[in-house]
């Protein structure tokens, strides 16, 4: 034990040095830190900033994803619209061409009809002519129908429909109860279910039903 009366001054000095040394050793020993305590200053705030940055990035990614999907949808709609407009332009060009060719078919029909009404002295010659014209017309009609979708639609006896028929004349008839196509004056054609030329027709209409005049009653 340091500081006794029997010891000299040298011993007291040695005790002082030992105490100082013990103090210095205690100061240099690491202080035990419990879990969750003693973290580096600023570390918690840094973690908060990192979390906020990740959330911001997620939101940004979501925004970019939505923008991409919208742009992709707009591009697809544009592609479909351009394709549709191109198809309509092609069909319009076809329709203009086919409208002219239909007039040629009318000429064939007139030639065939003229051959049918030939005089007896011309029957043999007109029959051969008729067969030749009819064959050419059939071939042309087949090509137009197969390649371009042109087709003739029959109308005789059909119910009158202004979407299909153009009435050039009307005739009252007791044999009908509604407007009926009574005669085909010019053939109608359509291209892939779209009317190219309306059929020109004569329409039979119901006769007006009128009550007979009964007068004012029996006379006295």
Swiss-Prot record:
Residues 1-55 are annotated as: Disordered. One of its GO terms (molecular function) is unfolded protein binding. CDD domains: GrpE. It is found in: Cytoplasm. PROSITE patterns: GRPE. One of its GO terms (cellular component) is cytoplasm. The keyword Calcium does not apply. It holds the Pfam family GrpE. One of its GO terms (biological process) is protein folding. Gene3D superfamilies: 3.90.20.20, Head domain of nucleotide exchange factor GrpE. The gene is grpE. This is Protein GrpE. PANTHER family: GRPE PROTEIN, GRPE PROTEIN HOMOLOG, MITOCHONDRIAL. The lineage of its organism: Bacteria, Pseudomonadati, Spirochaetota, Spirochaetia, Spirochaetales. Keywords: Chaperone, Cytoplasm, Stress response. Belongs to the GrpE family. Homodimer. The keyword Chaperone applies. Participates actively in the response to hyperosmotic and heat shock by preventing the aggregation of stress-denatured proteins, in association with DnaK and GrpE. It is the nucleotide exchange factor for DnaK and may function as a thermosensor. Unfolded proteins bind initially to DnaJ; upon interaction with the DnaJ-bound protein, DnaK hydrolyzes its bound ATP, resulting in the formation of a stable complex. GrpE releases ADP from DnaK; ATP binding to DnaK triggers the release of the substrate protein, thus completing the reaction cycle. It comes from the Bacteria.
């Amino acid at each position: 034990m340091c500081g006794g009366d029997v010891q000299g001054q040298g011993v007291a000095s040695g005790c002082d040095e030992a105490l100082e040394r013990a103090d210095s050793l205690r100061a240099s020993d690491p202080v035990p830190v419990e879990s969750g305590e003693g973290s580096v200053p600023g570390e918690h705030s840094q973690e908060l900033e990192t979390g906020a940055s990740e959330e911001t990035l997620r939101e940004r990614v979501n925004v970019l994803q939505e923008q991409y999907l919208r742009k992709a949808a707009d591009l697809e709609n544009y592609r479909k619209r351009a394709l549709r407009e191109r198809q309509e332009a092609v069909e319009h060009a076809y329709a203009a061409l086919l409208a002219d060719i239909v007039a040629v078919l009318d000429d064939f029909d007139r030639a065939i009809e003229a051959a049918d009404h030939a005089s007896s002295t011309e029957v043999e010659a007109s029959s051969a002519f008729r067969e030749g014209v009819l064959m050419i017309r059939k071939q042309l009609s087949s090509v137009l129908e197969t390649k371009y979708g042109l087709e003739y639609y029959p109308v005789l006896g059909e119910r009158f429909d202004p979407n299909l028929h153009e009435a050039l004349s009307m005739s009252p008839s007791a044999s009908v109860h509604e407007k009926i196509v009574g005669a085909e004056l010019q053939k109608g054609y359509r291209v892939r279910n779209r009317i190219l030329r309306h059929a020109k027709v004569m329409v039979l209409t119901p006769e007006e039903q009128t009550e007979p005049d009964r007068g004012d009653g029996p006379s006295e």
